[in-house]
Amino acid sequence: MDPAMELTERKFRHWCRLVESHSGIAVSDCWADFARRRMVEHQSFSRQPEGGREHLQALVDRLLIKETRFFRHPPSFNYVASVLSGDSDVPESDPQSEPPSGFSLWSVGCASGEEAYSLAMLSEQLCQAGKLSSPFRLLATDLSRSALDIARCGEYPRSRLRHLNAMQHAWFESAGDKFLRVRATLKKRIVFARHNLLDSLPGKTFDVIFCQNLLVYVAPTRRKMLLEKLA
């Protein structure tokens, strides 16, 4: 018998509701089988919700697929570059103005850090080109503790960086035969922190908010609310 069948439909839906109320993550039909198996693996379905917050958080961590890579979806990063450099058609930008000083960025749902480090590399490149004034700061947040541990460590398999160009590769140093490590000069630009978007927002404003990894997990009815909250 398929072990995932041991989880009754009623119990499965109950845990889906708990997960969404805790994290905003909606288990849609297209990945319900995956979620069932993760619940069985974690044995969370057999626990009472009272006093089980840590077990619920661990389940949420299992459900987050954490699919990401450096400079994922290049058009998004190209647009950020145009905004930072004042070359976009955003009304607030002024091509004749001085480069922004003290620029701040927020990577929402940064997963294992590739997105945040990509934004940092892009910003450093613009600084070196005189299109953005240092220092800039970057906040990178995620709900997954395990993903944030990887992000803070900043070590990635060499195979994950093969598509980067020479300028981007220069921000890494060797960490053994199979891994590369983000250099401290780039890492110090980023603060990694655990954050749930259902909670209050960080107590500051940001010039750029990047959230392309996040909305896939959120129910359509909640997406508009979150986007308005971020705006």
List where the protein language model places each region.
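Short, well-ordered amphipathic alpha-helices
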Residues: 78-88, 116-127
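Conserved hydrophobic residues forming the short capping helix/wall of the S-adenosyl-L-methionine
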Residues: 43, 123-127, 155
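Extended basic-aromatic, gly/pro-enriched interface segments that bind polyanionic ligands
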Residues: 108, 129-210, 214-222
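Conserved AdoMet
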Residues: 2-106
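A short glycine-rich, Lys/Arg-flanked "PGG" loop and its adjoining helix->strand segment in the class I
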Residues: 224-231
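Short strand->helix junction
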Residues: 25, 66-70, 112, 199, ...
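Conserved class I S-adenosyl-L-methionine
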Residues: 98-119, 136-139
